[in-house]
UniProtKB/Swiss-Prot annotation:
The gene is eutC. This is Ethanolamine ammonia-lyase small subunit. Belongs to the EutC family. HAMAP family: EutC (MF_00601). GO terms for biological process: amino acid metabolic process; ethanolamine catabolic process. Gene3D superfamilies: 6.10.140.690, 6.10.250.2060, Ethanolamine ammonia-lyase light chain (EutC). Its cofactor is adenosylcob(III)alamin. Binds between the large and small subunits.
């Protein structure tokens, strides 16, 4: 699927929902301007918040032949470029930012989604067989199965036999859920309903792994299960969300190749609203073809 097709899907879905298509915001001159500490000649004595935009835009190459080329390269990517060297070693500010980003990534893995946040969204909360974060990280197999209490809750409180069941799970990034929820779930649910699909009761699974959607689909009798789950964070990017969609999942027979994945959903990647439109189109095609993953015809 190329960019033109994605844009057409977004326009179609948003139009059917009666909403305007979001336009990309062009960076202003002020935003594009090189911050004080981004100058190649500025020393590392200036105190910056290592997580700020200024720190990310900092250029550490001293006495560059073409400073304008470095500035343009620095603006074009979030990768660690133009950081400079002190002999064979990274410069102090570059190293400190690396350590800060690493710390931020570890924090988002270890953080919990607050129960108050789940209640504020009006979501039913269930758990996998995991009881705490440490067990979640060391026993991924238990994160693939619902607890007995969760199974009872789904059977008693959720719509049975829906066309599409949407599930939200913390996964390996709490920030991915809390940062993107408002911009992806409401338009996703609205788009699915606008398409005439019977949508199940959305709910939140704490300590869930991807394969848990197979058991959910089997219990609820869902034709398509859509799991929105936090991705393992990378350095400097802790808010990336993934969508795993599968048709008619079964615990015993569904394999990873049966899933269709849309990853890198966040403001710096695939915008959540755009991802919602693509997921709606994907669910419709899965129901039409009665397939998902590598079994779908393109």
């Amino acid at each position: 699927m190329d960019q033109k097709q994605i844009e057409e899907i977004v326009r179609s879905v948003m139009a059917s929902m009666g909403q305007d298509v979001p336009q990309p915001v062009a960076p202003s001159k002020q935003e594009g301007a090189k911050p004080q500490c981004a100058s190649p000649t500025v020393t590392e004595s200036c105190a910056l918040d290592l997580g700020s935009a200024e720190a990310k835009a900092w250029i550490g190459v001293e006495n560059p032949h073409r400073a304008d080329v470095l500035t343009e390269l620095r603006r074009s990517t979030a990768a660690r470029v133009c950081t400079g060297r002190a002999g064979p070693r990274p410069r102090t500010q570059a190293l400190l930012r690396f350590l800060a980003d690493h710390s931020r990534s570890k924090d988002t893995v270890l953080k919990e989604v607050p129960e108050e946040w789940v209640k504020a969204q009006g979501l039913l909360e269930v758990r996998s067989e995991i009881s705490d974060k440490n067990l979640y990280l060391t026993r991924p197999d238990m994160g693939r199965r619902l607890s007995p209490e969760a199974i009872d809750a789904l059977k008693s409180q959720c719509v049975m036999n829906p066309d599409v069941q949407v599930v939200v799970s913390d996964g390996l990034s709490t920030d991915a859920i809390t940062a993107n929820y408002e911009e992806i779930l409401p338009p996703l649910l609205a788009g699915l309903k606008q398409a005439g699909l019977n949508v199940g009761t959305p709910f939140f699974v704490r300590y869930g792994r991807v394969k848990i959607e197979d058991q959910i689909g089997e219990i609820l009798g869902a034709k398509v299960v859509i799991l929105l789950v936090g991705e393992r964070p990378g350095l400097g990017q802790s808010e990336s969300l993934s969508c795993y969609a599968v048709y008619s999942p079964r615990v015993a027979t569904t394999v990873e190749a049966d899933r269709t994945c849309i990853s890198n959903i966040h403001q710096g990647g695939t915008p959540p609203v755009e991802a919602a439109a693509v997921i709606v189109d994907l669910a419709k095609r899965m129901l039409e073809q009665k397939a998902s993953g590598i079994n779908m015809t393109r």
